[in-house]
Amino acid sequence: IERENIFLSIGRIQQQKGQLETLRFLNSFKEIETNFMCYFVGGPSGSSGEEYLLELKESVKELSLDSHVEFLGNLPQVDIRNILNKAKLLIHTSQYETFGLVAIEANSMGVPVLTTNNGSMQEIIVNEENGYLVDGLHYQDVNTSIKNLINNNQYFEEVMINCMHKSKDYRWENTVDRLLDLYQEAKFS
């Protein structure tokens, strides 16, 4: 599968989702690689969503990321799927995430995830297997790995296969089977 050097950030535009951290990563990353584009998919949400979007757009200018970042707003699911099929990385910097469904969806389409090592994400993402976990927001630690991911097709294909395999753990039938096992275990304990 031939993919482009596209990064994605998918989710509502609000501080909780941490898109400003994504911009900080991109600013750090462009120091070692300039051949990439990051699309932000999702519209402003909540009382401060519009204000946060303006802050993000200002940061894009201040960080000289104009040629690397585009805000696409809300898109139909079919369009999100199409862009995921072209992407090489999902950047997920949400500060609080009870369950990272977007990460599983990206993995199911062969897209690795760069995320923070907190909450449920550390259960979904296995570092350097189906994505990259960073402590806090120290993205410099993964810049070289991400550069390798987008420039080494053989490595990308290995990670892509890992992503698709890992996402199968979260198929509904597997989830139901695990839930039934838990009930059986509780029943006979």
Residue locations for each model-derived region?
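A short, well-ordered alpha-helix in the C-terminal region of glycosyltransferases
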Residues: 141, 148, 155-169, 181
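Glycosyltransferase donor-sugar binding loop
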Residues: 10, 37-57
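Conserved donor-binding/catalytic core segment of Leloir-type glycosyltransferases
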Residues: 1-17, 23-26, 39-41
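Nucleotide-activated donor-binding/catalytic signature segment of Leloir-type glycosyltransferases, i.e.
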Residues: 53-75
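Conserved acidic donor-binding segment of nucleotide-sugar-dependent glycosyltransferases
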Residues: 127-128, 132-139, 148-153
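Short alpha-helical donor nucleotide-sugar binding micro-motif in glycosyltransferases
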Residues: 74-75, 82-87
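Short hydrophobic beta-strand element within catalytic cores of glycosyltransferases
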Residues: 103, 112-115, 125
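Aromatic "clamp/platform" in nucleotide-sugar-dependent glycosyltransferases that forms part
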Residues: 95
